[in-house]
């Protein structure tokens, strides 16, 4: 199983390097994989891609297409990815702007109209405050410099609000 996870991570890294080239700042693993409690049957693979500049629509589409291929090698819960700009990692803003999300929850929309979905898939996300905090403390740099060189401090109030928001949504989603 560890070999399978390593293959998935290598594919993610190769895909991002190919698509974003010099625009890619880093790829950071968080969640159960970073905490060392990953369970193939119950966990997803959580990661954040950081770029210097906003990706083009074509880059977003290519990323989603490649992640859908990689997802076939993944656990049932799949991949959960957010693409964010470097400026918001370093100079934190809450709720945090994002360029693209990918997860099982979005798959159907990707298949319905990939271009339209990628064109409109951006906004802000309160969950990123918690993700950034975890990445800075326990995250794994799959590619790029260490997390503490990319991610600034998240104010405690934003971190706690992010967790509160996640708990409130968990009740609805369960």
Task: Label the model's feature ranges.
Residues 14-19, 48-53, 98-104, 161:
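A generic short-segment signal for beta-strand/edge and adjacent turn/coil regions
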Residues 2, 6, 57-60, 153, ...:
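Generic detection of long, well-ordered alpha-helical segments
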Residues 21-23, 41, 74-77:
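Short helix-terminating capping/connector loops at secondary-structure junctions
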């Amino acid at each position: 199983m560890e070999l399978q996870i390593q293959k998935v991570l290598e594919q993610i890294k190769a895909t991002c390097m190919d698509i974003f080239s010099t625009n890619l700042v880093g790829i950071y693993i968080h969640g159960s994989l970073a905490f060392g409690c990953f369970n193939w049957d119950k966990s997803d693979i959580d990661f954040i891609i950081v770029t210097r500049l906003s990706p083009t629509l074509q880059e977003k589409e290519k990323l989603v297409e490649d992640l859908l291929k990689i997802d076939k090698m993944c656990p049932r819960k799949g991949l959960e990815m957010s693409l964010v700009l470097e400026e918001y990692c370093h100079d934190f803003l809450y709720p945090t702007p994002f360029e693209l999300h990918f997860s099982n929850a979005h798959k159907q929309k990707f298949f319905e109209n990939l271009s339209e979905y990628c064109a409109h898939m951006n906004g802000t996300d309160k969950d990123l405050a918690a993700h950034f905090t975890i990445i800075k403390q326990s995250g794994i740099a799959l590619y790029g410099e260490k997390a503490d060189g990319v991610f600034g401090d998240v104010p405690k109030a934003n971190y706690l609000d992010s967790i509160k928001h996640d708990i409130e949504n968990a009740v609805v989603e369960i």
